[in-house]
Design a protein with these regions (language model features):
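Alpha-helical transmembrane bundle of multi-pass membrane proteins
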Residues: 1-189, 198, 204, 208-319
């Protein structure tokens, strides 16, 4: 976006154009991911101290503060830089707390699909982001990049309003010895009476799980690396899955898509980004529909095999 480059880039006298250096562009993009990583770590604890709903409201407010700092930036790339980090802190907190609340309030038979729905909404948000940028790309003022950022407030407000309507996690309430509220929450989620025998049974099962967890005592970081259990094996598996997912390079296209598409000769990289976002969204819909039917591991194997085939085809074509 030309106006964005004019505000936060450097002027090149030889061409008479503004540009973003590779270092500055890399920092502006990377700081969001770094903020997400830090936010996921530091805000996760709020779920146990303040409750899932209030914790989500707090991280969304942090997200909004980051957006305000970015929108108010004017010819100060370092201000935008700071806003990007804070923006990421809020997004990282949401990425931990929202699936946590979903998994604890969702009915058992819908839990997998609803947690997957979180990822679906993320891909839909990416698609809407591409559309908003496409719609403002021809503006010749700061609205070119401020409008897409400003739209983030809409999604943040929807989350905050949603937290007023969603019941608190029954598990959190039982952990706080608020058993009556926990039963009311279970009843509201399943649209039955708080005195229903099924509600009482569910509350007892959650309470038993909480008590069993307490009997195990506080876990230590050292236990993560113990070879006496399978915790280390699961930890390594989880880390490797996420690591290899990033190494496939898919996020490279999401972050630098318009630049990449223009560099290979496409006239409008913004249109191609919308196509990418559309494919990403509908692929996630398929995953949500089948995850509970064929299982998580099998889904992972199928999609990884599909990716391998596509990458092999690309390598053969390029060769």
């Amino acid at each position: 976006m030309d106006n964005f480059k004019m505000n936060f880039g450097s002027y090149k006298h030889s061409t008479g154009e503004y540009y973003l250096s590779n270092v500055r562009m890399g920092l502006l993009v990377a700081m969001f991911s770094i903020g997400c990583a830090i936010g996921g770590l530091i805000f996760a604890r709020l779920a146990d101290t303040l409750g899932r709903r209030l914790a989500i409201v707090i991280v969304v407010l942090v997200y909004m503060v980051g957006a305000i700092i970015q929108i108010s930036s004017n010819h100060k790339w370092y201000q935008y830089f700071v806003g990007k980090i804070i923006y990421g802190l809020g997004a990282g907190g949401c990425s931990v707390l929202c699936p946590m609340l979903l998994s604890e309030i969702a009915p058992t038979d819908l839990r997998g699909g609803l947690v997957s729905l979180y990822q679906l909404n993320m891909t839909f948000g990416i698609f809407l982001g591409y559309c908003s940028v496409y719609g403002t790309r021809k503006y010749d003022n700061t609205a070119q990049w401020r409008v897409p950022l400003g739209l983030c407030f809409l999604w943040a407000l929807i989350i905050i309003i949603g937290m007023l309507l969603v019941p608190e996690s029954p598990r959190y309430l039982i952990e706080c010895e608020r058993h009556e509220e926990a039963r009311a929450s279970i009843a509201k989620i399943n649209k039955v009476s708080p005195e229903d025998p099924w509600v009482l049974k569910q509350a007892d099962e959650i309470n038993a799980g909480v008590l069993a967890h307490r009997e195990l005592g506080e876990a230590s970081w050292k236990e993560l690396f113990s070879v006496k259990t399978k915790v280390l094996q699961r930890l390594i598996t989880g880390i490797l899955v996420q690591t290899f997912l990033q190494l496939t390079g898919e996020n490279y296209f999401f972050f630098y898509g318009t630049t990449i598409f223009k560099s290979v000769g496409l006239t409008d990289g913004f249109e191609t980004s919308i196509v990418l976002g559309t494919v990403n969204f509908f692929s996630t819909i398929i995953a949500v529909m089948v995850v509970d039917k064929i299982g998580r591991r099998k889904c992972l194997f199928i999609w990884c095999s599909w990716d391998d085939g596509l990458y092999g085809h690309i390598c053969k074509y390029r060769g």
